[in-house]
Amino acid sequence: MQTHEIRKRFLDHFVKAGHTEVPSASVILDDPNLLFVNAGMVQFVPFFLGQRTPPYQRATSIQKCIRTPDIDEVGITTRHNTFFQMAGNFSFGDYFKKGAIEFAWTLLTNPVDQGGYGFDPEKLWATVYLDDDEAIQLWQEVAGLPLERIQRRGMADNYWSMGIPGPCGPSSEIYVDRGPEYGIEGGPEANEDRYIEIWNLVFMQNERGEGTGKSDFEILGPLPRKNIDTGMGIERVACLLQGVDNVYETDLLRPVIDAVAARAPRGYGRGSHSDDVRYRIIADHSRTAAILIGDGVSPGNDGRGYVLRRLLRRVIRSAKLLGIDDAVVGDLMATVRDAMGPSYPELVTDFDRIQRIAVAEETAFNRTLSSGSRLFEEAAQSTKAAGADRLSGRDAFTLHDTYGFPIELTLEMAAEADLAVDEEGFRSLMAEQRQRAKADAAARKQAHTDLTAYRELVDAHPTQFTGFDELTTEARILGIFVDGRRVPVVGHDTATAQHRIELVLDRSPFYAESGGQIADEGTITGTGASQTAKAAVSDVQKIAKTLWVHRVTVESGEFVEGDTVTAAVDPRWRHGATQGHSGTHMVHAALRQVLGPNAVQAGSLNRPGYLRFDFNWQGALTDDQRTQIEEVTNEAVEADFEVHSFTTELEKAKSMGAMALFGEAYPDEVRVVEIGGPFSLELCGGTHVRSSAQIGPVTILGESSVGSGVRRVEAYVGLDSFRHLAKERALMAGLASSLKVPSEEVPARVAGLVERLKAAEKELDRMRLANARAAAVNAVAGAERVGKVRLVAQRMAGGMSAGDLRTLVGDIRGKLGGDPAVVALIAEGDNDTVPFVVAVNPAAQDLGLRANELVKQFGAAVNGRGGGKADLAQGSGKGAAGIDAALAALRAEIDRS
């Protein structure tokens, strides 16, 4: 199925279901928080927040989206793309979870000849937010999805937000099983290469506040009304329906690759991975560049313009590395137009401008390449004249920084000149540049608008950290900031709770948040004439790795820049933090003992009494592995290992076997933390206990997935661990008392009760269905005549599900013969729900009756809604009081037909 057909079917499906088709917004919106539109719902945010009244209750669109954080990964893997199309359906206070699930399931599983995509229902899985029992029930009832193909996942996976303040809520994702040739079974939780996500249903019900990451943010409260936002990836669906492994093989990007291959001396897919990467970069970036130019972006040196410039220059550079020396961008824009024009007519109508801008950038960059090449030749000649065989890192950096030369291009040109490149020196200079940029970014994060004054503090007055040796330090105030502005004085009388107040000190015992360890808490108090001044420290951040910024609340007196103060860490807080950090090292060591050296750290968080450790690992841990990890850790606690730290050279630390976080940049001199000699040895700048016994018991709470190939272990330490165990013990004692068995027999007793309950429920269902079928026989005999139609419209016994009703409707319809007939059954369900099913046989359809139309009349009387096909439709409502009215409304509707 071609991509344009996939798009058409999506829009047609939802337009038929009462949605208004809304054109894609530009990828550029007037939003300071958003560089590019990166989700289908962005243009509807004011509606979701209740800031504007939508002109429709249901909408559908296919949105152009751009994401560039992983631009360097494009081409290297086949999963990353800078441009993608997000098909979505949206409800603004209209339908909610049930409707979203039903619409998605119908489109995915309906046969191709009925307007669907024809996915095999047996190949579909769903994930839901771990607390969303309602979604699990709906997947079973609406889609018939068995419980074994529904998986619960945590906030990082199934609680959606845009990553910035705005709407948020639990989500449910639909996955397609590609089969055993793509990996192990077990659903998305086990293998996201085999199980591919194609659709995300977001049940938008809250607004999120400030925060970082996928789960570290505040949920502010409910939205004015519940909304639905879904997103189906057009490219991923195209891959599956076209039977290819990745988007580069679809009708969207393969034409671009073929156009390049027709001009390059080396073809695509001929065994050279580096060449294939270049082909994919050209295909992806050409498409994104065309979309950006079409939406009004021009190449520039900052913001969106810089992204476009970088994309085009990567295209040009990749083409040259493939051996294409002449101009190529103009032809690539034409190929993109031909492939994407049917979906985005602006690429056709505005093609001349798009091509002109792209070609102008190519011409300019070719001049840059020419100038840079001359600089390279001069540097190469100077290097050889000096008797060296390696181009300096400074020369490579200048080529990169001044002329935009990627290091890969410099490396290739150097190899052609029989020279190596000082990559380490280049990376060091790049790191310095990034550090300067990070200092600015960190300053902005701290809301410092006076960046010049802030840089002065960074350069002239680095903070001396004293917290390894003492918890109380005499210090001088270097700077005071209120809401990001530097001020000379701040006092209790002038600073309210709404103000963000920060003190910068020349010396500090407070640990600043880093390395997974959260910041210390404590107090800063005045001395001498300012002895009445007191502030509570709630957070400490490090700027440019040299300056400690203390977030405070002024409780009394006033602080003046230059004053001498006493900075004191809360000893209980520090002790808890050291327990968590040392516990993290020990859990890491235990993981590697049990799982082997491939269990490498991917991240961590430790705070008083708690630790969280992420590590690279494929698949969930077994119960035995979790038990072993916990046992090894606690054996090390009991061994009372000595914990000590020392400073040494980086290379020496590595030769000793010290563990380092992959991808982290370390200085030449590093701090090493050793626990029990060979048990644990890691590079670390955090605070730790003096002996392993001070950690106290370590209790592993659980293990989960936080992404493809990354697992997470969470644990309590110290008193928090004891309290958790005491709570578990009390819970077990209560269960044992209720079940009247010893504690060790509780699991077996509970398992037995569960089996008995399942058997009883199964027997109850069988009896209820048998009674209902007996009633159905009587219903056939008592069918009433309404006009030309035989009608069976009955209120069934309570407790029947929609599935039970469908079974009975089928039985009754089969017994009514070939005369025009309509069957409508309604029952009182759980929690005052009212499920109903309507069936219309072919003869009645010939009279103009449609089940999906009748079910609307039926549902209106019970405050519900439904949908389906002409022969069979179903729905549900609220309130059994309306059942008789629903049956009467149905009779009246049939009588009118």
Swiss-Prot record:
Cofactor binding: number and manner: Binds 1 zinc ion per subunit.
GO function terms (MF aspect): alanine-tRNA ligase activity; aminoacyl-tRNA deacylase activity; ATP binding; tRNA binding; zinc ion binding
Pfam annotation, one family: tRNA_SAD
Keyword Nucleotide-binding in annotation: yes
InterPro entries: aa-tRNA-synth_II/BPL/LPL, Ala-tRNA-lgiase_IIc, Ala-tRNA-ligase_IIc_anticod-bd, Ala-tRNA-synth_IIc_core, Ala-tRNA-synth_IIc_N, Ala-tRNA_ligase, Ala_tRNA_ligase_euk/bac, DHHA1_dom
Regions that span the bilayer: none
Enzyme Commission code: 6.1.1.7
Entry keywords, A to Z: Aminoacyl-tRNA synthetase, ATP-binding, Cytoplasm, Ligase, Metal-binding, Nucleotide-binding, Protein biosynthesis, RNA-binding, tRNA-binding, Zinc
Matching NCBIfam families: alaS
Function, in words: Catalyzes the attachment of alanine to tRNA(Ala) in a two-step reaction: alanine is first activated by ATP to form Ala-AMP and then transferred to the acceptor end of tRNA(Ala). Also edits incorrectly charged Ser-tRNA(Ala) and Gly-tRNA(Ala) via its editing domain.
Protein's recorded name: Alanine--tRNA ligase
Top-level taxonomy: Bacteria, Bacillati, Actinomycetota, Actinomycetes, Mycobacteriales
Gene: alaS
